[in-house]
Structures are given as C-alpha cells and as structure tokens.
C-alpha cells in the first residue's frame, strides 16, 4: 500500500497513517516499478500547467524557426541507439577531409528552443533533473510530446538541433570545433546491433538493409578506430562491464534476463559523444560562462588503500594514491585480460573509483583522462545538458552579461540539486533491477549455476553467477563438513579440520536455495568448487531484450482510489522503510532460519572493496563515470547534503526588458 503518515512515531508506539492507495495484495514483479516510484518519491504525474505548456509547443518545425539556422538536412545524419530507445538525443555524420583526417558532426536535439527558462516545463524538468529508466518503463524528464515527439530526432522528419562540428586529425585528435544552431533531418534510425552486423561483421543481409547509409557508417567506423587509439594513448580507463537486461511479459513479470556486452557500434557512439562533450566544456571554460561541468575525481585514499590490499592477493601492484593515473588502472586491466579473475578484478577496480558529480567549475575527468568535460549530448533526459545548451547559445548570440539567466551562485546550487536527483534515480533503478533479479531467481529455486566468489566475510561467501550476473550469499552454515574461520588479513575462509580455503576469485557451482522479492536477498548453497575457470570471453549468447508491451506511463488502476495531495512525500519514506531501503539482515539459510539483526555480522571496514560492496547480498559499489554518454549506466549513490529548493533560479529581471524570444535565453 501507499500510506501517508499522519502522526509520527513516539517512544511508545510506531507511526500512524492513512492508506492512500492499494498497490496489490502481495508484492509481485508487476508492482516493483510502481513501488520504486513511490518509495523513492519520483515525480511521475504532470502538473496541469506543464501539460498546458507542452500542448502549446508546435508539433513540427515551422518556416519561421528555420530562419537564422544552418540547413544540414542534406547531410546523411543517422541515429544509432538501442532497439527499445524512443528518445533520440543525438545524430552523427562523418566524412574524410582533404589532406587526411575527418570531419565529425554531432547534432543534438535543441531542447532549449522549446523549454524556456522559468516556465512550467522548465521548473518540472529541473525538479526531475533526469529521466529514470526501468525495464520496459521510463519516468521521463520531459512530457512525451517533447521527449518522444518534437525534440526527438526521429527519422525522415525535420528537427531543430545544436551542432558540434569538429575537425579530427588522422591520430584521432580534435584540432578545431565550432557550435551552431541548425535544422536537420535524420536519414535513418539504426540500432547498435544492426550497425555492428553491417560494418563489424560484414553481414550481407545487414549491409543490404542499411545500404542507403552504408558509406556513412563505414566512415564513422574508420573514424572510431582512430579515436579509439587516441583514447588508448591518453590512458582512459575502459571498463568492459556487461549490462543486465530483462525481458518482461505482458503482466510485467520477468520473462527472461541476461547480460549483454558492448560492441564497436556502442563504442563508436560513445567516442563521438565524448568528443562533443569535451568541446562543449572547453568552449564554456574559455568564455568563463557559468555552467555545469561533469567532474570525476581520483580515487579516495581509503578506497584506494582497500584496492591495493585486494590486488596484493593477486600479485598485482599499483603506485601510491598521490601518484596514480588513469593509465595505471588501464595497465592493470591489460595485465589481467586473460586471467580467470578478470571480471572480479575489473569490478573491484571500478568500485574503487570516486563518484562523478556535477560541479560549477571544471575539475577534469579522471576516468576518461580528460582535462575538461561537460554533459552536452542528452538534453532530453538530463537537465545539466539543457543548461549547457543555454550557456552555449548565450555565447553564440549575446555579448551582454545581463542577458544570461544564471549567476555562479545559482549554478553551484543547481549542481548540487542535479547530482542529488541523479543519485535518486540511480537508487530507484538499482532497486528495481535487484528485485527483478530476485523475481527471476524465484523461478529457479533448486537450479544449479556456475559463479565466482566476489566477497568473503565472517558470515559466508558472496557469489556472482557467470551468465546472469546475479549475486547471492552462501551462508557459512552451508559450508558443511568443517568449521570455517575468517582470515581478515588474507580475506579468506579456512576450514579448521580440512584446511580447505575459499577466497576471492574462486570458481564455484551453487544451487539456488531461496530468493526474496520483499527484502532483495538471494541465498545459495555450495554444490562444489569448480576445478577450472571459464575462459575470460563474452558468452556470445544473443538475447532479445525489447520489453514486451512497452509502457511509458503508469497503468491506471481499475478501482479508483482518492489520493491526497503530497501522498508521495512522507508516505514514500514509510514505504522505503517497509521494503528495504536500508540493508536488511542476512539470514542463515537453514530449514528454520533465525533472522539476525543487521549488525550481527557487519561488513568490516578492513574487508576488500568486493566484500563490502556485497554486504547484505547486494552490489552497493560506486561506479566510475561511464565512458558512454548515452543512457546512464547504474552506479553507486551517496547523499550530498541538503537539497536546495527544487525550483530553478528565476531569470534575472532587468528593468522593463521584454522576455527573450524562444531559443534566445
């Protein structure tokens, strides 16, 4: 249920509240998304004034809007996205230059043309700050008439865009760039898999299907190879982490799941987006315009110390924290590329990173090994990108400081707000993913799978399954025939009688013992250690993860229930407590399990990153800023202090000035 607390708890009793909505008789997979939206207090209903503003937006580009813009409709720009994507932020085009090198055009949806500073659309977009993506469902930052309509770079229709036009030399370095407003027309809506089949695998059917834009795709692929080499030379960290995706049935239940791997088409787009983001950051920094930058700091000293201790178990070394560079991480990844512990070591390296965040000043990006970085390429789904567009347009169209809508102080407050909203969305996404994993495992209780030990604690082993990447606990009570002692220094469990050892990176076979959708816990039973590790390569298994019955708005309830204003405020916190926002205890998987308090076996601070991040049966590690600038990958979260008022700073008033026309903030 969704309940609103009317009386807070006291020392004698718990809180008292009123039920505002009934989600279902029991927690089912189909309710997981709705519960996450409520418990994380995600705005998902549009205020009337927002819908009114959205309805006033033109559904097609007009002749008046084309005036003053560069016409690039004849260029064969294409969009390359996932098969289930609906909001197309970016389109790309590349051509060889005389004398060598390339011209790369990255065209980004001109959301700032339609969302004016301070109007209802803008205020709601700022409050949300980001779109939140769940399997088969999205809570968008902008109404669908914009996010899936006039702002989306759909094929064969004119769209307004902001362009980053770059010259790139044969070594993959951007030698010059410029920004300008344009009107474009996407010549094809392509998917990563189709592009990879055509230019990577040279599949005849795929090449025939994309024949109209095949020369353009081959140009992009050739350019990507140069940019990838440049990325390697500068030492950017390249984490190859599979993404777990779910296929849902018509009722919202989990039909199948598995891990997907990136191909060159994903990386091609990533490099194009990164290049445009860098140029946006350099453009704004040079002109000293208040804007948001994307900052990623070097690893925190404490986490780096844990990492070094972990690596010593695998005979690996890294320099001191004050000397470490992104290239040092890349070198370790290269060294373990063919080792059976590759994925474990890579995951621990990744979780040792600091969190990326928005900042009002440029601090560089450690993970990408870049001196300047901003988010420019996804204004449909990220508010900071919209702010960057406004800053660039101000620089292109005005020389008067009074024409700019934001002060440095306002931008600093917005950086905190947007970072907090990003963490909230990530927590909600992770919550749903973990519950869907539990729902999938509920169907496989008794089944056996291969996995690797990713955490060792005093109370058992955490094991990640090879194919699905699901993690669960082998409680120490399931390690039979001996009494095991935990070695906190070497991070292993050792049998008192047999001397048998379990340590990080061990390959084991487990049986699914129990899975709880309510508390997001999965328990395994150890079947046997494996004598050999799997080859450190991709599974090669193909999945179709386009969600069945795609939903882009919450389903309406059959029985209407009166909802009080603000029901997703205090009620959200109650639901969060009821459904495990905090880590619940780990229960010993015995026939009659005794639930222990969460503090019975707290993960020690001396444990390696892998162990701490799996404590409680969940991956809680912080993720490095993804190399991709597409839909964000999941990473960790942290509270970053009190949020400022969830309203964007109002545009400054300058006695008697008329409002700026659209697109001229």
Residue map of PLM features:
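Catalytic nucleotidyl-transfer cores of nucleotide-processing enzymes
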Residues: 144-183
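Flexible glycine-rich surface loops and low-complexity tracts that mediate binding to linear polymers
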Residues: 1-12, 17-21, 159-170, 279, ...
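Single-stranded RNA-binding regions, centering on S1/OB-family and related RNA-binding modules
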Residues: 15, 29-40, 101, 384, ...
